[in-house]
Amino acid sequence: MIKFFLMVNKQGQTRLSKYYEHVDINKRALLETEVSKSCLSRSSEQCSFIEYKDFKLIYRQYAALFVVVGVNDTENEMAIYEFIHNFVEVLDGYFSRVSELDIMFNLDKVHIILDEMVLNGCIVETNRARILAPLLILDKLSES
């Protein structure tokens, strides 16, 4: 099960955070800082899976952004690793070459995409067309 989903830049600034288990608001900042430091401090030759406290971190770097997913110890790491890539491909498809600025200025749309893919910490959809369908409808409604 996915516990949290983060996108952080190379400076360690959180650009997107989504929690699927309750984490006290005061502890979230500390958790995000520790998690981003753990991922940012690793070289590109090191494994993208990290044992961290009572869960695993799976991360992938895309240009200046790191996508980090915290999961319980029973989750399949490779499945989550590919899920991260699928998420970024969906973002690329919608924003045509997604960037950090796209995420910052369209955070609501990024959350809609993530919510279409993950429900209560479980991956429920991976098909790009079905994920983007609600957003495309919203875009058409806002144009008219």
Swiss-Prot record:
GO cellular component term, pick one: trans-Golgi network
Task: Tell me where in or outside the cell this protein is found.
Answer: Golgi apparatus, trans-Golgi network membrane
Keyword Protein transport attributed: yes
The keyword Protein transport belongs to this UniProt entry's keyword annotation: yes
The domain of life is Eukaryota
**Primary subcellular site in the record, as a coarse category:** Golgi
Cited InterPro entries: AP_complex_ssu (IPR016635), AP_mu_sigma_su (IPR022775), Longin-like_dom_sf (IPR011012)
Coiled-coil zones: none
Stored SUPFAM superfamilies:
SNARE-like (SSF64356)
One GO BP: intracellular protein transport
Protein family membership:
Belongs to the adaptor complexes small subunit family.
Function summary: Component of the adaptor protein complex 4 (AP-4). Adaptor protein complexes are vesicle coat components involved both in vesicle formation and cargo selection. They control the vesicular transport of proteins in different trafficking pathways. AP-4 forms a non clathrin-associated coat on vesicles departing the trans-Golgi network (TGN) and may be involved in the targeting of proteins from the trans-Golgi network (TGN) to the endosomal-lysosomal system.
The record, for PANTHER family, names:
ADAPTOR COMPLEXES SMALL SUBUNIT FAMILY (PTHR11753)
Query: How does the record describe its quaternary structure?
Result: Adaptor protein complex 4 (AP-4) is a heterotetramer composed of two large adaptins (epsilon-type subunit AP4E1 and beta-type subunit AP4B1), a medium adaptin (mu-type subunit AP4M1) and a small adaptin (sigma-type AP4S1).
Q: What is this protein called?
A: AP-4 complex subunit sigma-1
**What is the name of the gene encoding this protein?**
Ap4s1
